[in-house]
Structure formats: structure tokens, C-alpha cells
């Protein structure tokens, strides 16, 4: 992922709402979001090159998402894929804090990353380019791009502000996708300096990156965890020319027994109205 906006325990009827864009080279093979054959409680896209993922959930209410930390000068070769940090949490049994304490020990062996993991009880953040220790995420609206949580880059600040405007009471997938489709670039004077050229900084400053040189926004994801046990998960995938290549939508209902849930795929379009809150 390269942009994540989220509301954690900030709305009365939802524990978590997420709107996220994944930016990647279009030549890197990936599968769209779906339930994994080898881990049937995991709903996520999949990197077909390394086997991990960038964002996903489980039927017992776990959530994880990752962004790369942008600093080209310290990139190493021959290191583990960062997508495994997401998939390992989703397929494992460790709690969020316990898992990130283990990640902290292994973090130096990876290229730069920022990672969010959580369940119904808590949400935590860690980066191997920050303080290094897991941090409990406080209730509120947060944003993450290719740096630390809530670093005030223009795209992060814009996404957080628009997120707050759109999700005051209820979740709506169409509003999330509208937010994630903004391809306007920031002004040059507002740009961070992350070790790439000014031209590249400008390109990367948009919420949705239109493809140039085979790189851009590959998919958008909108999801919510309702406090009544309901989940919505929607993903929209893009071709290199910017057109939509496909959408998937799921409505999930968690049972009271941990680890079990019923699910229904909602079709190729996100629902036009949100699920009713109880």
C-alpha cells in the first residue's frame, strides 16, 4: 500500500473504517482480493511473486496493512519480502502486540516498512525506520503513506480531511472510492524530500497515482468493521491505462464464536447503500 486513511474507534457504529490505495509496478503479478485457498479465513489480495499481501482481514476480525518506507538510498537486495509481515499476522494466532514485538526483533532484516495490525480489541503500528517499538494507535482518524503514521505529507493530510468529511456517521464504499480517485498533485513547495527526483515527488504526491513508466495505483480498497459484527470489504482494480479492470465486494457477518463467520460475495459492484447499523 502507499496510502491508508482510517478511522479507529472514531465513529459510534464502527470500530474501524479503512480507505487505501496500493501503488506498485503493473508488471508485478498479483491476485485480486478473495479468500485464500490455503488459509480460508483470510480475505486479501495476493502478491504472486513473493506470496504475501499488502492489506487483508480475517473472519475472526483481524486486520493488517503495510506501506513501504520510501528511502531509495538504503534499499537492500536479497532480503525477505515485506508482504510476508502482513500475511504472517493474518494467518497466525498471535495478538497484535505480541506479533509486533516479534516483528521488532526481525525488523532490521527487511527494507523499510510501516505496518498496522489489529483485532477487535486494539490496533498497533510499527516501522523499522522509526523508533522501532510497537505503538498503540489511539482512537481517531489517521493516515499513512510511505513514511511514519500521521506524517503530515500533503496527500496524507488531504486524505484525512476528506475522510473526516465523508465518514461522519456511516460507511459508504462509493464515497471511499471517490476519495481514493483524486489524482491531483501537490504544489512543489509542499513536497517532502524522500531521496527521489522532484518530478517523481510530484507524481507520488497524488492520492491516486496515474501510471507512468509502468508504475501507479493498482487497486483501491474500502472496508469497515461494524460494532454489530458486520464487515464490508470492497476492492477496485485498475489497468495501466487507468481504466477499471474489476471490482469485488464482500459482506461478512462475524458470529459470536471467535474464528467463525458467514460470508456473502456481493457481486461486481459495491452496494449503493451502507449496511444498517444497529
Question: What do these predicted ranges mean?
Answer:
Residues 1-260, 264-265, 270, 274-278:
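N-terminal nucleophile
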Amino acid at each position: 500500500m502507499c496510502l491508508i486513511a482510517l478511522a479507529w474507534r472514531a465513529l459510534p457504529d464502527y470500530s474501524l473504517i479503512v480507505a487505501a490505495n496500493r501503488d506498485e509496478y503493473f508488471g508485478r503479478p498479483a491476485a485480486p482480493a478473495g479468500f485464500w485457498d490455503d488459509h480460508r479465513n483470510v480475505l486479501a489480495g495476493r502478491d504472486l511473486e513473493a506470496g504475501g499481501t499488502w492489506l487483508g482481514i480475517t473472519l475472526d476480525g483481524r486486520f493488517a496493512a503495510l506501506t513501504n518506507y520510501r528511502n531509495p538510498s538504503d534499499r537492500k537486495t536479497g532480503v525477505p519480502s515485506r508482504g510476508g509481515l502482513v500475511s504472517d499476522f493474518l494467518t497466525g494466532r498471535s495478538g497484535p502486540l505480541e506479533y509486533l514485538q516479534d516483528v521488532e526483533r526481525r525488523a532490521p532484516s527487511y527494507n523499510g516498512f510501516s505496518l498496522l495490525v489489529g483485532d477487535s480489541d486494539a490496533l498497533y503500528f510499527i516501522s523499522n525506520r522509526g523508533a522501532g517499538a510497537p505503538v498503540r494507535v489511539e482512537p481517531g482518524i489517521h493516515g499513512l503513506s510511505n513514511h511514519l503514521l500521521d506524517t503530515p505529507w500533503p496527500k496524507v493530510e488531504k486524505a484525512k480531511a476528506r475522510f473526516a468529511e465523508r465518514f461522519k456517521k456511516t460507511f459508504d464504499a462509493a464515497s471511499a472510492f471517490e476519495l481514493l480517485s483524486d489524482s491531483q498533485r501537490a504544489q512543489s513547495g509542499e513536497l517532502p524530500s524522500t531521496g527521489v527526483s522532484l518530478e517523481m515527488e510530484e507524481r507520488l504526491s497524488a492520492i491516486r497515482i496515474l501510471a507512468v513508466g509502468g508504475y501507479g495505483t493498482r487497486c483501491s480498497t474500502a472496508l469497515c468493521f461494524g460494532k454489530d459484527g458486520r464487515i464490508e470489504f470492497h476492492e477496485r482494480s485498475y489497468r495501466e491505462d487507468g481504466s477499471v479492470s474489476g471490482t469485488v465486494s464482500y459482506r461478512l457477518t462475524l458470529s459470536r464464536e471467535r474464528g467463525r463467520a458467514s460470508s456473502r460475495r456481493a457481486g461486481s459492484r459495491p452496494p449503493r447503500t451502507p449496511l444498517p447499523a444497529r
